[in-house]
Amino acid sequence: MDFTAYVENAKKKARLANIEEVRKDIDKSWVKEKIHNHVLAFDGIMTEEDIREGILNNIIIASKFCKDPGKQNISENLAGEVLGLTKLVSSGKRCVRFNDAGDIVSTSTGNTKSADFILKDYYATQKYTDGEGGAQDNQRNDVIDFLKRGSIKHKVAAIVDGPYWDKYRPILREEFASNPNVWITSVTELTEN
């Protein structure tokens, strides 16, 4: 399965659904707040009513005010669905993070990002990244931190897909080649094997 194509198709569908949602929710507080903040940011050169009408009648304007599918955990949800994995909690006492000693902890301060899934007997982080740049490099650093700290005492995995990871997955594998507690894979690889 080409997971990248699958995710991109799902994101496209989500964008269209999100445009319809922002139009449907035009009178709800979350949309009104976005409109109000936009008017303030542009020093009132347009009115709230101008923007409201634009959202309802212009797909380009609506697309600027709808929810961002990149922030809706689409790839994480699809990865879990495709692989038949249950999402682990991302906060609270049952959350799985690692501290500097490789111990499992639940607090976020000074510790790794939370594990997303259990894949076989590995605590796994899952990332889908489609571009280059600072934010993407931060995601890579989060994965490296998770693998380094988690592998001190546990088996850990990175399930990484998307164009960014097509480039960096081999580099990551090389970096952790001598660590038997680390498994680096992708949804595409897991579904093809």
Stretch-by-stretch model annotation:
Residues 1-74:
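Nuclease-adjacent, charged terminal/linker segments that flank catalytic cores
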Residues 63-101:
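Extracellular-facing segments of soluble proteins and assemblies that are Gly/Ser/Thr-biased and enriched
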Residues 171-193:
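Charged, structured surface patches that assemble and position nucleic-acid processing machinery
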